[in-house]
Amino acid sequence: MEAKEQDVSLGANKFPERQPLGIAAQSQDEPKDYQEPPPAPLFEPSELTSWSFYRAGIAEFIATFLFLYITVLTVMGVVRESSKCKTVGIQGIAWAFGGMIFALVYCTAGISGGHINPAVTFGLFLARKLSLTRAIFYMVMQVLGAICGAGVVKGFEGKQRFGDLNGGANFVAPGYTKGDGLGAEIVGTFILVYTVFSATDAKRSARDSHVPILAPLPIGFAVFLVHLATIPITGTGINPARSLGAAIVFNKKIGWNDHWIFWVGPFIGAALAALYHQVVIRAIPFKSK
């Protein structure tokens, strides 16, 4: 009997007590299979002497240039036709934006992080994923790339036709208020930046490192879905560089009237997403040192 009781006891100890749903199997005492990157310093002067710093900025410039080139050309093709049945329509525009983000994030993630968006850069800066030095440099390069991308499209289309087709610029559509537009930009950018944080989380990256496509895919898909929802409201900004580049090249009053929405909205959305992910999801302020 004693032997049997011992066997039962040993057998029971072979299996850990059932955990509630949603609780990670890994205990806090076990070593992590991933490493949290240390917080980036606010200023990093040594970056200015590093080639990788400038290479990353160039990658952001080229990626944003290509992003504006493809997406604004797609918008031009849809707006040009009187019958939307002859074009790819809103779905095609959404696929162009989402597909380009997927491809460009995949190409540049290992070089610059694949931001291609000042709102993404701002959110990651607030989470101390990069320094202020790098954040400002990225934003400048993104805006310059966007201006050049929209400028090339204007060269293809011609000044007259580019102006007649509104140059792919963002503005609040008739029937919607500025508050509607601002809300759409805040929520849309929140979805995007929250997806970026989740897809690039250190723990998830360690687990899915053998499938490098898994980070760009949900980010691109988030951009696609947000465009499907908000193109009828604002043309979908959620990217201040995209909005500013198109507005500068278009350079008409309608492109500037509501332009502040496409900076304030995305930056608020990015800040809320960073706060939610870092404080609520990851509980970083509450973790023991």
Swiss-Prot record:
<feature type="topological domain" description="Cytoplasmic">
    <location>
        <begin position="282"/>
        <end position="289"/>
    </location>
</feature>
<feature type="topological domain" description="Cytoplasmic">
    <location>
        <begin position="113"/>
        <end position="135"/>
    </location>
</feature>
<dbReference type="InterPro" id="IPR022357">
    <property type="entry name" value="MIP_CS"/>
</dbReference>
<protein>
    <recommendedName>
        <fullName>Probable aquaporin PIP-type 7a</fullName>
    </recommendedName>
</protein>
<feature type="transmembrane region" description="Helical; Name=6">
    <location>
        <begin position="261"/>
        <end position="281"/>
    </location>
</feature>
<comment type="similarity">
    <text>Belongs to the MIP/aquaporin (TC 1.A.8) family. PIP (TC 1.A.8.11) subfamily.</text>
</comment>
<keyword id="KW-0677">Repeat</keyword>
<feature type="region of interest" description="Disordered">
    <location>
        <begin position="1"/>
        <end position="39"/>
    </location>
</feature>
<keyword id="KW-0812">Transmembrane</keyword>
<feature type="short sequence motif" description="NPA 2">
    <location>
        <begin position="239"/>
        <end position="241"/>
    </location>
</feature>
<feature type="short sequence motif" description="NPA 1">
    <location>
        <begin position="117"/>
        <end position="119"/>
    </location>
</feature>
<keyword id="KW-1133">Transmembrane helix</keyword>
<dbReference type="InterPro" id="IPR000425">
    <property type="entry name" value="MIP"/>
</dbReference>
<feature type="topological domain" description="Extracellular">
    <location>
        <begin position="234"/>
        <end position="260"/>
    </location>
</feature>
<keyword id="KW-0346">Stress response</keyword>
<feature type="transmembrane region" description="Helical; Name=4">
    <location>
        <begin position="179"/>
        <end position="199"/>
    </location>
</feature>
<feature type="transmembrane region" description="Helical; Name=5">
    <location>
        <begin position="213"/>
        <end position="233"/>
    </location>
</feature>
<feature type="transmembrane region" description="Helical; Name=1">
    <location>
        <begin position="58"/>
        <end position="78"/>
    </location>
</feature>
<feature type="transmembrane region" description="Helical; Name=2">
    <location>
        <begin position="92"/>
        <end position="112"/>
    </location>
</feature>
<feature type="topological domain" description="Extracellular">
    <location>
        <begin position="157"/>
        <end position="178"/>
    </location>
</feature>
<keyword id="KW-0813">Transport</keyword>
<feature type="transmembrane region" description="Helical; Name=3">
    <location>
        <begin position="136"/>
        <end position="156"/>
    </location>
</feature>
<dbReference type="GO" id="GO:0005886">
    <property type="term" value="C:plasma membrane"/>
</dbReference>
<dbReference type="GO" id="GO:0015267">
    <property type="term" value="F:channel activity"/>
</dbReference>
<dbReference type="Pfam" id="PF00230">
    <property type="entry name" value="MIP"/>
</dbReference>
<dbReference type="InterPro" id="IPR023271">
    <property type="entry name" value="Aquaporin-like"/>
</dbReference>
<keyword id="KW-1003">Cell membrane</keyword>
<feature type="topological domain" description="Cytoplasmic">
    <location>
        <begin position="1"/>
        <end position="57"/>
    </location>
</feature>
<comment type="function">
    <text>Aquaporins facilitate the transport of water and small neutral solutes across cell membranes.</text>
</comment>
<feature type="topological domain" description="Extracellular">
    <location>
        <begin position="79"/>
        <end position="91"/>
    </location>
</feature>
<feature type="topological domain" description="Cytoplasmic">
    <location>
        <begin position="200"/>
        <end position="212"/>
    </location>
</feature>
<dbReference type="InterPro" id="IPR034294">
    <property type="entry name" value="Aquaporin_transptr"/>
</dbReference>
<keyword id="KW-0472">Membrane</keyword>
